[in-house]
Structure formats: structure tokens, C-alpha cells
Amino acid sequence: MRWHHLFGLVFGIITFTWIFSGLMSMNPWKIFDSGAPKLNINAYQAGELDALHFPLSIQKALIAFQATGFYPRELEWQLLDGKGYYIGFDNNGQSRILAAETNATPFKQFAWQQLENAATRLMGASKPSASSILTDYDIYYYQRAAHTMTGHIEKRLPILRLEFDDAYSTWLHIDPYTGNVTKLDAYKRISRWLFAFLHSWDWVPLLNSRPLWDSLMIIFSAGGLMVSASGIIIGWRRLKRKLA
């Protein structure tokens, strides 16, 4: 009992936050669903993604990429402002963009103003209340190690963040290397704190201070294990006395 109380005093709050954040990961009662309408990607693209926007063949696109010393291993289609683009990725994860037209030259990223104009169309009557280019990670946009939670999602820098004055306080993150858009409304930002932060302590200064983060996670996990194990032992002893 004494050890259970001691471990509980030191690690009880951490253990509770992990239990609570684990519950939040299930989105109970859909509390993190804002009800906001889905993004109208066709409005962002100014058209529907189809082969008509890609008059340049894949073979010629590969030749154009390779002519600049870039050797793609994967190609994606992107439509922006009604114009087709090939997004090429090499075996190192680097990317280049090529307009799907004759005599086009590969380039690294879309223009910021082009992306902002296209993204604004997504939100209809709502206009950006703030626009910023992130060159460093922050509490809402950050990269995790590949083997950790959400680490498989690549978060490149810089990116464009647009904050809107709509009813859902929507933020858009636009990747200039691909033109891809992700949405983060007020409900998802709350989820970021109640689930992701409390569950993995993925605060950017901590993530940048490994192995400090690893050491804390090991200590917290061991403490939580001792609280749980000592509680099981106490419960088992009481059960034995009742059954005796």
C-alpha cells in the first residue's frame, strides 16, 4: 500500500493524463467533429482532375525532369488554377513540379500568392484574417520521428498558413512543394492538446531535445507501470482475503 501511494503521488497525474488522452483519441461522442463542410477541392483546383488537363505525356514529363538532373521514382497529378502539373518524387523524397505542357521547365515550389488565391476559393465567402509563411515548426505544425505516433506523415517547411474568420475558425496549411491542403479547425486544435499533446508530450522543444524526450517517456511509462502493478497487487491481496 505504501509503495502504491508513493508511486501514485509521483506518477498519478501522468498516468491519468495518458488514460484520459487515450479516451480522447477515440473522439468520444464525436466531440471533436465540428460539423464544418468538407473542403471543395474542385474550387481550389478550378476544375476537376482529369486527363484533359495533362496534354504532356508521362514519358515526355520524365524526360523533362531528367534533363535537369532530377530522376523521379513517383509521379502525382495536381490541378491548380485549372492547369495540370506533374509532381515528381525521387528516391530521397525530394520533389519537383512540372507544368503538363510542352517546353515546360521543372521548378521546386508554387508561388505563395498563387496558393493563397487558390486556397481562398475553398472557403467561399470567408476571407483570410491572417496569412503567414511558417519557416519553423510550432505547436500545431510539427514533424515527428518516423517510428513515433503520426511520424509517417511528412511535414515539410516552409508552408503557408491561412487563418479564416468563419464560424469554425478554420486554418489551412498549404504545402508549396505539392499544392496539397490540410484543414485544422478549432475543434481539431483542441484535440491536438487533449489527445496528441497529453498522450505523447510532443512539444516541439522537447522533440528537439532528444534523448531527453525519450528518457522522460521511459521514466513516465515505468512509473505508470508501477502504479498499475502495485494497484493490481493490492486488489489481488484483498480478493484473496475475501475468498479465504
Residue ranges and their predicted role:
Residues 1-244:
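Conserved histidines in hydrophobic membrane contexts and catalytic metal-binding motifs
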